[in-house]
Design a protein with these regions (language model features):
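Negatively charged
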Residues: 1-180
């Protein structure tokens, strides 16, 4: 089942009740809410993403989204641009989220200018090939926990990964393999 672009471009959508959605057989959620400019909050904690393989651009350009709950998501493979340009996002509930076999982190959190803290420590990033601008322009980000991230020689680019993360106070990258 594909939910690709289901609500993409619904620029005037302010409220969305999808509490009865059964997502247990959904494989693609890419671009699902892309460009939903007027949504301010979204609770997807009931989504079963066990079979979902593609999350790219899922929330990109949700410019007014302030609160997002994706607790218990099973992220895997391609999460490129997942939260790209969610400028006003302040509350991102990632509790219980598992991230396994992630391959693409390009622009995942880029331009999330209001996020102050992220704990992604348990994410499996051993198969990541690109971290191109993953956190770029996260100007309010003060704490980023990725100290357990272990990359491999598959990682070929870290171009501007932390570009303009001007509020970051400390960062432990000792487990990143930068030989790729």
């Amino acid at each position: 089942v594909s939910f690709t672009k289901m609500f993409s471009g619904c620029t005037n959508l302010t409220n969305l009740d999808i509490s009865n959605f059964n997502t247990s057989n959904v494989v693609y959620m890419s671009y699902m809410f892309s460009g939903c400019n007027k949504l301010t909050s979204l609770n997807l904690s009931h989504f079963d993403t066990t079979k979902t393989n593609n999350f790219e651009f899922m929330f990109q350009h949700c410019n007014n989204l302030e609160s997002l709950n994706i607790s218990n998501f099973k992220l895997k493979n391609n999460i490129r641009c997942l939260f790209y340009y969610c400028n006003l996002l302040k509350e991102l509930n990632l509790s219980g989220v598992t991230a396994t076999n992630i391959t693409n982190l390009q622009w995942t959190f880029a331009n999330c200018k209001n996020l102050k803290s992220l704990d992604l420590n348990d994410w499996d990033v051993q198969n990541v090939t690109t971290m191109h601008q993953t956190f770029s322009s996260c100007t309010a980000l003060e704490t980023l926990n990725i100290s357990n991230w272990k990359t491999s020689d598959k990682l070929t680019t870290m171009y501007a990964t932390f570009y303009e993360c001007s509020s970051l106070k400390q960062l432990n990258l000792s487990n990143l393999d930068t030989t790729g």
